[in-house]
Each structure stands twice: as C-alpha cells, then as structure tokens.
Design a protein with these regions (language model features):
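Short, charged surface segments at domain edges that flank catalytic/cofactor-binding sites
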Residues: 6-39
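General structural signal for secondary-structure boundaries
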Residues: 22-26, 90, 101-103
C-alpha cells in the first residue's frame, strides 16, 4: 500500500514559491501535508474539512481574489516578502491570511 509520503520525492523545504514549477509546488505541498500530519498550518484543523469556525469569524470577500482561487481545497502558503513557502493551508485560510493579515 502506498502512503502519501512514498508518492512523491522529498524536497528541501521551504522552496521559493514564484520560481517553483507546478510539479515542485505540488511536491512541496504534499510534503508539508505529511509533515503537518494533515493539519492546516494556519488553523491547525484537518485539511480534509472546511474551517467553518474561521469563515464565520472572518467572512471572505471572494471578489478580492482571482478566478479559480477556491478551486483547490489545499494551498501552498508562502511569505510575500521572502517568497518562501510556509506550509499547507485550507484555501479559505489562505484567503483569510491575505484579506485580513496581508499575508
């Protein structure tokens, strides 16, 4: 039986987000998910469920985000100052981090 950690080649984290290929971003996201034991790096709840408690506390204005922003449930969060990845987060947490905390 294959586990998530055996399905991708480990990468040296963090990675530079803007210069990483889609496949490197995917590998990094998968590695973060594994290292975070399936929990969101922001809200610490399982990445398999929508973080409704945060959405209720911080309503998301979807018009602020590009089309397709919410097409993928798990995002690779990165620092906009250093361009280095931080961890895997819910797409909603990524939106909240940007909209409310300029991350």
């Amino acid at each position: 039986m294959s586990t998530l950690s055996s399905m991708y080649k480990p990468v040296q984290l963090p990675i530079k987000y803007s210069t990483a290929s889609p496949s490197l971003r995917r590998s990094a996201r998968n590695q973060y998910i594994s290292e975070q034991k399936g929990l969101c790096a922001h809200c610490n709840t399982p990445l398999s469920v929508i973080p409704q408690h945060l959405i209720d506390e911080f309503p998301i204005n979807s018009s602020l985000f590009p089309k397709g922003m919410f097409d993928y449930a798990i995002h690779l969060h990165h620092c906009h100052d250093t361009d280095l990845t931080i961890g895997a987060v819910h797409c909603q947490c990524n939106a909240i981090l940007w909209q409310y905390f300029n991350e």
